[in-house]
C-alpha cells in the first residue's frame, strides 16, 4: 500500500480509504468486521464515516470495530446532513457544528477524530 500525507499534516494515510456508508444498514457487524480486518491486512489505515450514515449507526459500528486498534487507524467523519426534523438540523453555525461533532465522537466512542 502506498501512503500520502493528509493535507499539510504529518499524518500518513493509505491511498485507499475504507468508506462505511453501508455499515449498520446493508452491512452487518460480522461482515463489517471482516471488511475492516481485510482492509487493515492490506495496509489500509484510513476509514471514513459520517453522522448521517444509517443515522449515526455507522459511526457507532465503526467505533466498536476499532476498539483496541484505534492507534492503527486515521478516522474521518463528516457532519452537515439532516439528522432530524428540528428546524435548525441543517445549519452551519459554530454551535451546531460543535454539537454535531460532539455527538459523532460520542457515537464513535472516541476522544478525537483525525
Q: Model-predicted segments: where are they?
A:
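N-terminal binding-site loop/beta-alpha segment at the start of enzyme catalytic domains
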Residues: 1-74
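Glycine/proline-rich, positively charged
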Residues: 27, 84-114
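Short C-terminal domain-edge/linker segments immediately following a structured domain
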Residues: 46-50, 77-79, 106-109
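Structural motif corresponding to the early beta-alpha repeats
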Residues: 68-94
